[in-house]
Structure formats: C-alpha cells, structure tokens
C-alpha cells in the first residue's frame, strides 16, 4: 500500500497531517530552530546540521540563517549553493538546485499546492517539484512557485514571482516573471 509520503512525492493528493509526515516536519523544523540559533562562529555545528537536514549536498552549502524548510530531505543541493537571510524552501516535492546557485534574502521556493475546491482543501494538498539549474542568481524577495524549472546561468530579478519555466542564460523579472533579455558577453564588461 502506498504511503502518504509516496503520494506526496509523486505530486498526488495526500494527507499532510499523516503522523509520519508530521514527525518528519518536526525533525526538520527542530534542526532549523537549532541552526537559526547558532552564532556566526559556529561553522562546524552549522555544517553538521546541514548534513542532517538536507537530502543531498549539505557538505558545501553556505547560508546566513534564519532558514526554514518543511522536510529538508527533499532538497538536493549542488556544490556551493548560497542562501542569504530568511530563505524558505517548502520541499513537499523534490527541490533540486544546481552548483554555485545564489539566493538573495527572503527568497521563497514553494512546492505545495492546494485544491481550488474547498472540500478537498480541508484535508488534502499536493505539490509539484522545482528544479533550479547551476550558476543561477535569484534576487532577494523572489517567489518560485510549484512546478517551475529555472535554467542554468539565469538571473531572476528581486521581487519576481516565477510562475513558469525560465530558460538558460536569461535575465527574467517581474510579477509574473518574464524573460527580459538574454545574458551576453557584454554583461561581463560592466564588472571591473
């Protein structure tokens, strides 16, 4: 028989109050609470928490707490991912983040969805996975919504609401987020 966790990860309707899922969320939130109470000099303690919290990739992640997530185990991080202050990852479905991706302060990555029909919404929810490529920069306050894929080397403007896929190598911004232009070699000329 399929568990509520199996249904959740498959993007199907599931019961978020299932006791096993509640225990998993409690575990992640307890770890986040410990992490968020650390001092800047507690680097080794933070590293140990990352290894316990994340499904994959806690070895090289860098972050400025506070940080919040639902499960942690559904977050897969590439090399040297950076989260600035107040980031939230609601990882009901898998969240995959590529190497060297940077998140500004208060970015929210949100996989959960709720049925529009009120009766279903009382007891069930569902989610869609999110994938973010390598070398992406997500500006502060951006919201990344369920089912979105952001391509490698993309830049998402601060405060954007990403409701659909963003291709590789573009600057995208707005609410809803849309492609503004491609990132070109001339963009490197501004950096001295």
Residue ranges with predicted function:
Residues 67-77, 82-149, 175-192:
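Flexible, glycine/small-residue-enriched loop-and-beta-strand segment within the central core
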Residues 1-60, 177-192:
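Terminal amphipathic alpha-helical/low-complexity segments used for targeting or macromolecular assembly
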Residues 159-160, 165-167, 177, 183-184:
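Short glycine-rich donor-binding/catalytic loop of glycosyltransferases
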Residues 102, 154-155:
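Short alpha-helix at the nucleotide-sugar/activated-sugar donor binding site of glycosyltransferases
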Residues 62, 137, 155, 171-173:
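Short-chain dehydrogenase/reductase
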Residues 148-151, 166:
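Extended beta-solenoid/beta-helix repeat architectures
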